[in-house]
Each structure stands twice: as C-alpha cells, then as structure tokens.
C-alpha cells in the first residue's frame, strides 16, 4: 500500500552513485526561511536598469530568554535580542501588495529563501549582503488590526 509512495520519496532524496551516471543525478536541496516580526520602515520600490522592480523593507525578529538558576528560572532577568532582516519582494503581484499595504510597525509573516550577494558601494568597496527573498506567501497584520494575505 505505502510501498510505491515510499520508494518515490526515497528516490527523490537519495543520490544514486554509479561510475556512469554520477554526473547526471541531481540531488534535491532546501533553502527556506519563515519569519514573523515587525516592519522597521515603510517599503521602498527600486528598479535597476534593465531589471524588474523590487520592493524592499526591513523586518525585526526578537528572541527572548530568562537568565538565572534553573530552580528559580521564573525569577531571572529577561534578556532580548533583536535581529534585523532585509526583505526583497520580486514577484509582480506580491511586490505590489507589499508596497501598497506593508507599513512601519505592521506584524508580518514572510516565507522565502536566503540569498547572499555582493555589491559595490559608493566608495567602490565590495560589500556582502544577506537578503530574504520573499516567495509565495506574505501575511500582513497591520498596525490598525486588519489582516491581509498576499499570495503570488
């Protein structure tokens, strides 16, 4: 009953090694990020010559923990770390929804992938940038309490 589906899944994730076909086998990988946080600035739309426009905004995620002994764990000091993420939205439908409805302070859920790139700054110095490229889903819970889900 489950034999065929199990074999299909197994074949997708296991790389078959052989001398003849080893260069022909493509193995699957996964690059997926899910973030839930607050928008740090209103989105901006940018367009580079010859390329499609992109909507860009920053997103803050927080990590909180208590310090102290395990016996009095609830009595310890609360610490918090905020991490800022650069979100880029390239998909035409989702890009426009993000530009129109995402505002500073809104609570956002973003699903996408991590991208590492390089660029030259205005002083001609090579810089590295980490960007989250929004995929198919962007859920906006605005400051006013309204919710909007954008799917592309």
Swiss-Prot record:
List N6-succinyllysine occurrences by residue.
Answer: 122
Q: Which Pfam families match?
A: SSB
Query: SSB domain: from which residue to which, for each copy?
Result: 30-141
* Positions of post-translational N6-acetyllysine modification: 113
Q: How does it assemble?
A: Homotetramer. Interacts with MPG/AAG, through inhibition of its glycosylase activity it potentially prevents formation of DNA breaks in ssDNA, ensuring that base removal primarily occurs in dsDNA. Interacts with POLDIP2. Interacts with PRIMPOL.
Q: Where is the transit peptide?
A: 1-16
- Keyword Transit peptide set for record: yes
Q: Name one GO molecular function term.
A: single-stranded DNA binding
Compartments, record wording: Mitochondrion; Mitochondrion matrix, Mitochondrion nucleoid
- Which residues are annotated with the PTM Phosphoserine? 67, 79
Its Gene Ontology cellular component terms are: mitochondrial nucleoid; mitochondrion
Please report the name of this protein according to its UniProt entry. Answer: Single-stranded DNA-binding protein, mitochondrial
Species in which this protein is naturally found: Mus musculus
Its keywords, alphabetically, are: Acetylation, DNA replication, DNA-binding, Mitochondrion, Mitochondrion nucleoid, Phosphoprotein, Transit peptide
> Which InterPro entries would you find in this protein's record?
NA-bd_OB-fold (IPR012340), Primosome_PriB/ssb (IPR000424), ssDNA-bd (IPR011344)
What does the record list as coiled-coil region(s)?
none
Predominant location:
mitochondrion
Which PANTHER family does UniProt cross-reference here? SINGLE-STRANDED DNA-BINDING PROTEIN (PTHR10302), SINGLE-STRANDED DNA-BINDING PROTEIN, MITOCHONDRIAL (PTHR10302:SF0)
GO BP field: DNA replication; mitochondrion organization; positive regulation of mitochondrial DNA replication; protein homotetramerization
List, alphabetically, the CDD domains matched: SSB_OBF
Q: What is the lineage of its organism?
A: Eukaryota, Metazoa, Chordata, Craniata, Vertebrata
Q: In which tissues is it expressed?
A: Expressed in all the layers of the retina (at protein level).
